[in-house]
Amino acid sequence: MGNFPLIYGFRELVAGAGFVAGVTVSGRALVKHEEDGWWVYGVEPGGIAERGDNEQEAYLNFKQSLREVLADSAVLNSSFQSFRADVEDLGRQRNEVWAAEWEIAREALRTGELKPEGAFAELPRETGAVLTGISALELPKPTAEDNAVETTLLAAA
């Protein structure tokens, strides 16, 4: 199988100096099988790539790295406002090389040239526009409902 265009999303609670934030991440990634294993390359946000022995492990490692970047941002920023600006900026970062390959892979999936295998065969397909970004909402009085963690994995087609 060639490159695979992935759309992902999740929510995360992030605590910083005097604040708790609900963070929503919506992104695109390119999944590739390389000689040394499976890799997930961040398209939006860009700048993050992780490896695994299979596609699921690579994605989980990628997601964990993104979570660590969010946690690091909370440590480095002294206020919610600066944290929000930082993570929103991260969400706008785009890797143009992987973006071009992602579009090629999406078109290959649409035309049937790319045949999803394994875990990819079961993913629902998204054929519309893909909105990406990171948003943060300050939670002045966090509740148990704020713990809801949504995870979205879609194939871009």
Question: Where do the protein language model's features map onto the residues?
Answer:
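Generic structural signal for short, flexible, solvent-exposed coil/loop and linker residues
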Residues: 18-20, 37-39, 55
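Short aromatic-glycine-(Arg/Gly/Cys) micro-motifs in beta-strand/loop hairpins
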Residues: 25-46
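A short, exposed loop/beta-hairpin motif centered on an aromatic-Gly-Thr core
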Residues: 43-57
